[in-house]
A protein has these predicted regions:
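Phosphodiester-processing cores and adjacent nucleic acid-binding clamps
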Residues: 1-173
Length: 173
């Protein structure tokens, strides 16, 4: 299934207050524009986000090179440089570890409103797990600044979960 946004760009940009806008992963608007219309089309999408949130609050997301995607990282790095935004390393993690794949698949099927069998085509060949620092460095080796930027963003967004007292299940990460 197609994902429908819960909030629109206008409402989010009006909220302001230090929101950070990631451009999205492989299925996000920037990558869709890049695949459909090339770098110029992707730049237009990036410009819309910069106009809405400001260049300091827009982060060009790069999930790392898998297969023949090295050139995509170069294009994204150049888009970030040219727009004055930052390239950030991400992994698109959906699960904490490979042992949680079955649970992650069930949650994805639920989100899609389909059975597990029907959702199989949407789960992708690369299941996404949290990666170690060494794995992230290997995945994003061509763009070490993206790793540094991701660490800075994570530090600025970090907070103590005990402050909101959620009842989360204990899990090993």
């Amino acid at each position: 299934g197609q994902r429908n946004p819960r909030h629109d760009l206008v409402n989010l940009s009006e909220a302001g207050g230090g929101l950070v806008a990631l451009t999205g992963g492989r299925r996000g608007p920037l990558m869709r524009a890049l695949r459909a219309g090339g770098a110029l089309s992707a730049r237009r999408v990036l410009d819309v986000l910069v106009d809405a949130f400001g260049r300091d609050h827009v982060l060009v997301e790069w999930q790392g090179a898998r297969g023949d995607e090295d050139e995509v990282g170069e294009v994204l790095a150049e888009l970030a440089r040219a727009s004055g935004t930052r390239l950030v390393a991400t992994s698109g993690a959906r699960m904490s570890s490979p042992s949680k794949q079955a649970l992650g698949d069930i949650l994805a099927a639920n989100r899609l409103g389909s059975s597990l069998d029907e959702a199989e085509a949407h789960l992708g060949a690369h299941r996404s797990f949290l990666l170690s620092p060494a794995e992230m460095a290997q995945l994003h080796g061509a763009h070490p600044q993206a790793l540094d930027n991701a660490c800075e963003v994570a530090a600025s967004c970090a907070f103590d979960l005990r402050l909101v007292a959620p009842r989360l299940p204990r899990t090993q990460v």
